[in-house]
Amino acid sequence: MKFVIESLTKNSGRLGRLHIKDGAPGQRTPLLMQTTKGGSIPYLSADVFESHVTETPQLLELTLSTIDHMSEALAQFNSADRGLSDYIGFPGHLNVLLLRDPCETTPAGGNDRDIQPLFTRRGKESLSPKRYMEMVASLRPDIYQGLCDADTNAESAKKRVQKSVDRTEKFMHYIYEHKSKVDSTLLAPIVGGYNTFARTQSIKHALEQPSGSYGGYVFEGFHTNGLSATILDASKLLPIVEHCVGQLEEEKPRMVPGAYTPLTTLELIGLGMDLFDTSYAYCAAVNFKALTFTFVQDEVVHVPFLDITDDAIKEDFSPLLKNCVCLSCQKHTRAYVHHLYKTNELLGPILLMVHNLHHYMAFFEAIRESIARDGLPQLTELVRRQNGDSQVDYSIAPNRKVISKATMGKGFAAAAV
């Protein structure tokens, strides 16, 4: 894997191009990885994704917690001309393997001296460094993260944070020794919660490795995934990230998985982060929210979401977002998507995912354009206030509205309870 920085500014982060393997097209950074569950884009088939969201090859974010059951079959499927992306139905796309699903809250606890817990659909699995490398060898991803203990957040005690660093170092010692058996690029995990000393210790362990031991960094341990990433305090997060970035070399990409809000994402990019994922778009969709925040300068005050459970839109025949060119907005209306919610139709989350992914990918294109002209601070301020007088709240609250079976199929006639 090769990472080339094309533009670096003090106020606007950096533009780069990531070349993951020979023969594959380069990926422009800041890059938005496509989050998957069980090897699939949530709610979307490969055909729908490639025909109605984007035809451009993407970097797929796969998680071991949702595809661990595939390792045995993939050991027989993989060959010189077939890989993990081919197996899941996305030939031509690149992939990165992470441990935890950024879309769902990772349970706390279950940590042991010599194993890392992996929470799957079948329950908790015990993952030793040896077993992890065997699974990576079977799955053969293009990129994979090192095994780490990321069971920390802003409330974690100092003892728990230190244990996460010590256990990660122990795991990574084995990974570094045996990585030559895997023909994939390794990402070195940087853990340590919100403790600058612990983060520095984690960074030093990575920097002590021989040149070429890994191709980039993945920052873990800031949150427990799922909606927790949308509500974290950026005033605590950003100083820690800035502290870490100052100790890292420029020529390696930096990944921060999780459902960070658009505003926090922009602030992280300003500090030098490169790779993000679409888990925020997914979390919004499964909680019945269409993304409507603007990243194009105008004079109109905008809101971050459209709540499609709101009865106020049941007769609103405008698109989810004005001037959006996605399939959902071109072919359907707010009233129709609200009707799909009330009748519990599967097409509802499909249309929301199509719109949210399209909108978030356009957002990242706008980010790259703004960095190219050194305009990231202006874009950040627009996203922060949306032309209003105060900062917009991008956190996502879980939708707790329930539609009873008695009201299903009655469309606009019955209200959710």
UniProtKB/Swiss-Prot annotation:
Cellular component GO terms held in the UniProt record: cytoplasm
Cofactor remark: Binds 1 zinc ion per subunit.
An individual GO BP term: tRNA-guanine transglycosylation
Residue positions binding Zn(2+): C324, C326, C329, H355
Keywords from the UniProt entry: Cytoplasm, Metal-binding, tRNA processing, Zinc
GO molecular function: metal ion binding; tRNA-guanosine(34) queuine transglycosylase activity
Highest taxon in the source lineage: Eukaryota
Cofactor: Zn(2+)
Record's subcellular location: Cytoplasm
Function field: Non-catalytic subunit of the queuine tRNA-ribosyltransferase (TGT) that catalyzes the base-exchange of a guanine (G) residue with queuine (Q) at position 34 (anticodon wobble position) in tRNAs with GU(N) anticodons (tRNA-Asp, -Asn, -His and -Tyr), resulting in the hypermodified nucleoside queuosine (7-(((4,5-cis-dihydroxy-2-cyclopenten-1-yl)amino)methyl)-7-deazaguanosine).
Record's subunit section: Heterodimer of a catalytic subunit and an accessory subunit.
Family per similarity comment: Belongs to the queuine tRNA-ribosyltransferase family. QTRT2 subfamily.
Name of the protein in its database record: Queuine tRNA-ribosyltransferase accessory subunit 2
Organism listed in the record: Drosophila persimilis
Lineage: Eukaryota, Metazoa, Ecdysozoa, Arthropoda, Hexapoda
